[in-house]
Regions:
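Conserved C-terminal portion of the radical SAM core fold
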Residues: 4, 65-67, 234-251, 277, ...
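Glycine- and acidic-residue-enriched helix-capping/strand-helix junction motifs
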Residues: 13-25
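Radical SAM enzyme core and accessory elements
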Residues: 2-6, 40, 58, 64, ...
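Hydrophobic positions in alpha-helices of CheY-like receiver
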Residues: 31, 81-85, 89, 269, ...
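Structural recognition of alpha->loop->beta junctions
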Residues: 109-130, 299-309, 372-381
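Short helix-loop-beta junction
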Residues: 26-40
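Radical SAM [4Fe-4S] cluster-binding motif and immediate context
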Residues: 173-344, 355
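Glycine-rich beta-alpha loop elements in corrinoid/cobalamin-binding modules
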Residues: 39-169
């Protein structure tokens, strides 16, 4: 029998958490239903845990065909493995599929691809199930790859031929599932001694109706939606719960679009977590422009702490930018009403923005963030650097030229791992300049993003800023401009030192001379924001003494007793790693009402009960656990904020 290997490597997070290889699992689940393939091929392994290249390759013996699932996070690793395999087994057919290998259109601009990657025999374009089946069947015959649809194959002298497209699957619900046909049972059994915590993927819908230019599934090819039935999803999720899967990643780009089915999915997840304890968490991308439909679903998920928050994926609030990326957002009035509704329902909201988009200016970028603050969005905002994905318009020279997009290669945006040395260091192409933002302005925007994240959206000065916004009508922009300018000149302070270090670090990132993020004492990389919070809380008392000094010198000094109350409130509004919860807090002013409800400031005896969310408190000084659970896992729902209840209401 011919040996098949499938390769879909992922990082091992915290040495125990790894993603089951959904893409290659789907490929094999379909192919093995073909009796000719079943008779003539043996799936020797699906390799999905990164390791040193030599150890990884040692798992492969006498392969006939190897299929690589390629993404931005494993591209360099796959290339190195494929090169070694080709040298060792020159007759092996190496097939690249996934999202990162060049599309047929992109190959028009990358005519030297097979010269640079001579070890690759062919590329699969679009969905892979039907195409890979054809490849395996033709491999048993004359190896006339021109008979296979949906591929580009290498010919003589690194030239290539692209065949006709494979039609999309019209009924993905009828396709076999690796969760249900035993494919993943074998993998779980193989690694049971490792005690891995598995992440699994479900695909409620394949495709997306939107055409966002930064997204790989924004092409016409994927525009028509194909959805799976609740009954099939139910069986898959039950398998995950039975196998103690901790984290489910929903590949549906618009969860909530099919609200009846998706509500059933949410209720099932809650039921299984209550009954069996798994899954612990569920991540999804919510339906765009359909926020009101998502609220009932998010409320259900929130019952059992499955929800990471309801997303508003704005990407930008600047109209010329939205036009350039073919994106339409909700109006300002709707946004305000939606945020208000979610607050009334006690639903955490987080917003997504992208830094480096076409037509965005430094001022429009800043204005967008402060607009969100002014609309009472004080929960997490994820602001992500724009990574150039090759099979998007950002890989098109015409589009790039039109908007003056320039990029630099940086280290991969991978965090919470220790095995970055295992195989090639992945890299990413991050936008460093556009026709509306110079490189220096991009760097400044990164500094602003980081600064506002640690100070406001991670909460360290948020409640002070909100107090003075309501009490003295000091705008958020004015407050944070003063805060930044004050501490940038004081490098001997906690915040000033962090500002200085980040400015150096982000320049080094774009010069490709360092990784993204900070190494902490657990030996792993953490995002810059997470790592800075960790370092600030290591010096919390000094940090807040210096913040108090800033307030007195730059903001307000008329009544120091008011400053004392707001400082005490601010410190207790965040979960502190060495505090015992719950406890009571006594203040001389109704700071809570001023901050939360914009009430007039009143003097008196005010008593508050301070607590944390269940399982998000009482860390007994374990700062790594505190930072992991609150600022890594729990940031989107604002777990780092304490729950404050007034006894004076």
């Amino acid at each position: 029998m011919e040996n098949i290997y499938l390769v879909e490597p992922s990082f091992l997070y915290e040495d125990i958490q790894v993603r089951l290889p959904y893409s290659t699992g789907l490929i094999w689940s379909h192919c093995k239903t073909n009796k000719i393939i079943e008779k003539n091929y043996k799936l020797s392994d699906i390799l999905f845990v990164r390791d040193r290249i030599d150890k990884f390759v040692d798992n492969i013996y006498n392969p006939s065909v190897i299929g690589f699932s390629c993404f931005v996070w494993n591209w360099a690793f796959n290339n190195e493995v494929a090169k070694v395999i080709k040298e060792k087994y020159p007759d092996c057919v190496i097939v690249y599929g996934g999202q990162h290998q060049p599309s047929a259109d992109r190959l028009k601009h990358e005519k030297d691809f097979f010269k640079k990657h001579s070890y690759v025999n062919m590329l699969v374009h679009g969905e892979g199930e039907l195409t890979f089946e054809q490849i395996l069947l033709e491999n048993l015959k004359e190896k006339d790859w021109s008979k296979v649809t949906g591929i580009t194959y290498q010919t003589n002298n690194y030239k290539f031929v692209t065949t006709l497209s494979t039609p999309r699957i019209t009924d993905i619900d009828s396709m076999p599932s690796p969760y249900l046909d035993g494919t993943f049972n074998n993998l779980v059994e193989k690694y049971k001694d490792k005690n891995f915590r598995f992440t699994c993927t479900i695909e409620g819908v394949r495709g997306c109706p939107y055409r966002c230019t930064f997204c790989e599934i924004g092409s016409l090819y994927f525009q028509k939606l194909q959805r799976q039935s609740f009954n099939k999803l139910k069986k898959e999720i039950e398998w995950m719960s039975e196998n103690k899967v901790v984290y489910i990643d929903n590949a549906d780009s618009n969860f909530g679009l099919f609200e009846d089915r998706d509500l059933k999915v949410a209720k099932l997840l809650v039921y299984l977590k209550k009954k069996k304890g798994f899954p612990i968490s569920f991540r999804n991308d919510w339906a765009k422009d359909r926020g009101e439909r998502c609220i009932p679903i998010a409320k259900v998920l929130n019952e059992e702490d499955l929800n990471k928050g309801l997303t508003l994926a704005f990407q930008s609030l600047y109209e010329p930018t939205l036009k350039a990326i073919m994106r339409k957002n909700v109006t300002g009035k709707y946004m305000k009403e939606f945020l208000k509704k979610c607050k009334e329902e006690n639903l955490p909201i987080y917003v997504e923005l992208i830094l480096g988009l076409p037509e965005e200016t430094l001022e429009s970028f800043k204005r967008g963030i402060f607009t969100l603050m002014n609309n009472n969005q004080h929960n997490y905002i994820g602001i992500y650097p724009l990574s150039i994905l090759p099979n998007t318009p950002f890989g098109d020279p015409v589009y790039i030229k039109k908007y003056g997009v320039k990029y630099r290669k940086t280290k991969s945006l991978s965090y919470h791992i220790t095995n970055t040395e295992m195989g090639s260091q992945e890299d990413e192409k991050i936008v460093c300049e556009t026709n509306t933002m110079t490189h220096e302005e991009i760097l400044k925007a990164h500094n602003i993003r980081w600064f506002l994240m640690i100070c406001h959206f991670f909460g360290t000065t948020q409640f002070i800023a909100r107090f003075f916004k309501n009490y003295l009508d000091i705008s958020y922009e004015s407050f944070y401009d003063k805060l930044y300018e004050y501490f940038i000149k004081k490098e001997d302070t906690v915040l000033g030192d962090e500002i200085k270090k980040f400015k150096v670090a982000i320049k080094e990132v774009f010069n490709d001379s360092r990784y993204w993020g900070w190494y902490l004492e657990d030996g792993r990389t953490w995002e810059f924001d997470e790592g800075s919070i960790f370092k600030i809380f290591k010096q919390k008392d000094q940090f807040y003494r210096e913040i108090r000094r800033f307030i007195v010198e730059e903001i307000y000094a008329d009544d120091l007793s008011i400053i004392d109350s707001i400082m005490e409130y601010q410190e207790n509004a965040l979960i502190i790693p060495d505090k015992k919860y719950p406890y009571k807090l006594n203040l001389d002013y109704n700071i809570h009402d001023v901050v939360k409800n914009n009430k007039n400031l009143m003097n008196g005896d005010y008593v508050y009960d301070i607590d944390g969310m269940p399982k998000s408190k009482n860390y007994n000084g374990d700062m790594i656990k505190w930072c992991r659970e609150l600022y890594w896992w729990g940031r989107k729902e604002g777990r780092y904020k304490s729950i404050i209840r007034s006894y004076n209401d």
